[in-house]
């Protein structure tokens, strides 16, 4: 599934910055460690499909990120697939942390991932934990098909490739850190 993220729900942090994230209006606070790609070039719809190499050449950097899940419904996790999609795929916020620019050398399927809550390890994966598979394959699909209704992908956009850890529910006041080995770290404080 894909859903466009609105600019007011994306926070891009500098190296070492902990993002204060307002959560007073959240129905739930679910956190997930994710890999986010920052695009340097447009990938408009075209007749000839983009190759993985084409897509990789359009990426400025790969970053560690935390997606904060929320719902606009009264209850969490009881909606069907179409209702979840209408709920912006349960997106609440995206906090983008540090990253690396040499994406051609990156092997995301072998990246260790950890998610920390209040200094305690909540989830650890020795390698990529997203059941959808290779994030570059997902990004290539998005460039070739998934983003056509949005006019393609554009320079400056962020593309997150799904949870590596599953969703961990946290309480207001929680401090969360996602680490993607060899890529970077993202941190937030629920305020």
Enumerate the predicted regions with their spans:
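Catalytic-core "active-site belt" of small-molecule-metabolizing enzymes
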Residues: 1-134, 139-140, 147-148, 175, ...
